[in-house]
Swiss-Prot record:
Keyword line: Chloroplast, Electron transport, Membrane, Photosynthesis, Plastid, Thylakoid, Transmembrane, Transmembrane helix, Transport
Protein name, per record: Cytochrome b6-f complex subunit 6
Entry membrane topology: Single-pass membrane protein
GO molecular function terms listed in the Swiss-Prot or TrEMBL record: electron transporter, transferring electrons within cytochrome b6/f complex of photosystem II activity
Family note: Belongs to the PetL family.
């Protein structure tokens, strides 16, 4: 259970960071 929870937490963090980077890149391109 612990490994599954940590895996999902890592996956969620990776998705959040990726989406934040994509939004930042799109904003920079719009400027």
């Amino acid at each position: 259970m612990l490994t599954i929870t940590s895996y999902f937490g890592f996956l969620l963090a990776a998705l959040t960071i990726t989406s934040a980077l994509l939004i930042g890149l799109s904003k920079i391109r719009l400027i």
